[in-house]
A protein has these predicted regions:
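Transmembrane beta-strands of outer-membrane beta-barrel pores
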Residues: 29-35, 72-78, 111, 131-137, ...
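Short glycine/proline- and aromatic-enriched beta-strand/turn motifs that initiate or cap beta-hairpins
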Residues: 20-61, 138
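Predominantly the C-terminal beta-signal and adjacent terminal strand-loop region
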Residues: 186-245
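Glycine- and aromatic-enriched membrane insertion/assembly motifs of diderm outer-membrane
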Residues: 46-98
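Extracellular loop and loop/strand-boundary signature of outer-membrane beta-barrel proteins
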Residues: 37-44, 88-96, 114, 161-167
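Repeated loop/turn-to-beta-strand initiation elements of outer-membrane beta-barrel proteins
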Residues: 23, 65-68, 115, 188-191
């Protein structure tokens, strides 16, 4: 299982306020960071992997404690052995980036009640969870461009020599677990900031899960590009391995 986290700072606008129920719409901007096999060993180095995240949201509040939210977000995940402090992982020399689209349906519970018209106590704290579907597509940079890794079967997925390794799907499910804070700027506008890990059910966010595929067999079934990108360990002179005819 791999995890990614979203840090969102957003503006919320309330187009309709009723006595007990109301709707809100919002636009979010923030950052995303990945945690997995290609994460750095030093925690502080994770900041080097933060990438932009954007989202739009619509929520229905049943009362000042409970709401449901539908959101769509787009963000990038990235990992790189080059920033790892462990020499054996630098030697491994793997990296990836992935553009991710997520749609999520979540329930929200407000620990501090949320009332956008309550200006004397404008802060609300909430927790949220639900289910998210996302589409990812890990790619690696090689020979001047980015290449999608899933079709290359870099760990032998789908090859005759690895019948137990099935190709992973690019559409996946995640469980968000969110802690957030809202601040009422006015009765119709609020700001919020939230921290939201997503727990996934795939080990291939980064195209890395198990062991290297056997090079010659991979080359025969998937070609030279797959052969090069499956094993990028650095040679003694500091250059990545390259396999050519």
């Amino acid at each position: 299982m791999k995890i990614f986290r979203l840090f969102i700072i957003s503006i919320l606008i309330y187009p309709q306020i009723a006595s007990a129920q109301f709707f809100e719409i919002g636009l979010g901007i923030g950052g995303s960071v990945y945690y997995g096999d290609l994460s750095p060993d030093e925690a502080a180095d994770n900041f080097k992997l933060v990438r932009p995240a954007l989202g739009v949201f619509a929520s229905h509040h049943f009362n000042d404690r409970v709401a449901f939210q539908l959101g769509i977000q787009n963000f990038t995940l990235a990992g790189d052995d080059k920033i790892n402090s462990k020499e054996n992982l630098k030697y491994r020399n793997l990296s990836f980036r992935s553009n991710v689209w997520e749609i999520a349906l979540k329930g929200e519970f407000y620990i501090l009640p949320f009332d956008p018209e309550r200006m004397e106590l404008p802060i609300s704290i909430y927790v949220s969870s639900g289910i998210a579907g996302f589409f990812h597509n890990p790619k690696a940079f090689f020979a001047g461009t980015y290449h999608a890794l899933q079709p290359l079967s870099t760990e032998g997925q789908g090859l005759s020599s690895f019948p137990e390794r099935k190709p992973y799907k690019l559409a996946q499910i995640a469980i968000p677990a969110i802690l957030g804070l809202k601040y009422n700027v006015s009765p119709t506008i609020s700001l919020f900031i939230e921290f939201g890990p997503r727990f996934t059910f795939t080990d291939y966010l980064d195209d890395v899960s198990s062991t290297y595929a056997v090079g010659d067999e991979l080359r025969e079934e998937r070609g030279d590009l797959a052969f090069n990108l499956s094993d990028r360990r650095i040679l003694p002179d500091g250059e990545p391995k390259k396999y050519e005819d």
